[in-house]
């Protein structure tokens, strides 16, 4: 999809002014079809043939075992992506679209960073599962993955916080018939929301560590309860914050929900696996964050 969209945007064959959401939909559909064809080719190359048969008892068993995972994904999707919808539904019509757009501009960077953390969790799942199955010690793997995730996400978050205004100006230009005052106000609001969402980014990235650990251990009941609590907190705070703070209220809600679910999952994993990260680990993380903030601040002011 990246290659197709890049070709459409920068090849010079197609005018950029003609690019619209339909082109993106067509590009995404084409990329899925190409991926499917490649996947089928690889399977056929290794198996020689592909026969499709339906074994209904087996299918029902798979569905039954998959339901807790499906419910978890559904609940997490609710409290991760409800904000733009609620902004449009809760705020008056004359400002809802504008505020949803302001939130979406900052959310795109949050979502991009979130994909990096998600890929990290995909790698960790089989590692955690293998260690748990063998009955080996998890302390080292959890500590290393947790430290690596915190280091990576803190760097991204702090850089985005300090340079939020610059990033918004780089990504979004002034629109036709828009005054410079309106543009600056829109960019400032989006940059302030980005700062808050970067706190959510760190929290959700930590969730990918301990949520993945609990998933590998089969603790789906606890994870679904945590996700359900997250949905309740999300809805409650959004209905309180959005009417008062508008798009910024949605970002504040996201921060609260992600931090709450992150903390709960951490303590559940700590209790189940008897995790002991040690005071030296937390001191090293805190020292790194202080050094990173100081360095970024000096670079920003120079």
Where are these regions (language model features)?
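Helix-terminus/linker motif at the lipid-water interface of multi-pass membrane proteins
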Residues: 12, 16-17, 74-112, 127-130, ...
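Membrane-interface junctions at transmembrane-helix termini in multi-pass inner-membrane proteins
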Residues: 1, 18, 195-229, 240, ...
């Amino acid at each position: 999809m990246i290659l197709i969209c890049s070709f459409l945007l920068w090849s010079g064959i197609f005018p950029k002014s003609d690019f619209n959401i339909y082109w993106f939909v067509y590009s995404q559909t084409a990329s899925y079809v190409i991926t499917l064809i490649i996947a089928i080719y690889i399977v056929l190359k290794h198996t020689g043939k592909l026969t499709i048969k339906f074994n209904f008892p087996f299918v029902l068993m798979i569905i039954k075992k998959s339901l807790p995972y499906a419910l978890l994904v559904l609940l997490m999707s609710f409290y991760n992506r409800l904000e733009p919808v609620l902004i449009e539904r809760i705020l008056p019509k004359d400002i809802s679209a504008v505020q949803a757009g302001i939130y979406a501009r900052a959310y795109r960077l949050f979502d991009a960073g979130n994909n990096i953390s998600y890929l990290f969790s995909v790698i960790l799942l089989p590692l955690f599962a293998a260690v748990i199955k063998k009955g080996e010690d998890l302390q080292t793997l959890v500590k290393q993955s947790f430290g690596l995730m915190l280091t990576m996400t803190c760097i991204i978050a702090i850089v985005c916080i300090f340079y939020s205004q610059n990033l918004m100006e780089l990504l979004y230009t002034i629109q036709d018939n828009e005054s410079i005052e309106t543009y600056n106000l829109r960019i400032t609001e989006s940059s302030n929301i980005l700062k808050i969402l970067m706190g959510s980014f760190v929290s959700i990235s930590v969730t990918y560590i301990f949520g993945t650990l609990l998933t590998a251990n089969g603790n789906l009941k606890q994870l679904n309860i945590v996700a359900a609590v997250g949905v309740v907190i999300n809805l409650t705070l959004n209905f309180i914050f959005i009417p008062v703070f508008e798009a910024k209220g949605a970002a504040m809600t996201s921060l609260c929900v992600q931090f709450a679910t992150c903390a709960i999952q951490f303590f559940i994993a700590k209790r189940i696996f008897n995790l002991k990260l040690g005071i030296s680990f937390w001191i090293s993380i805190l020292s790194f964050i202080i050094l990173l903030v100081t360095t970024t601040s000096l670079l920003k002011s120079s």
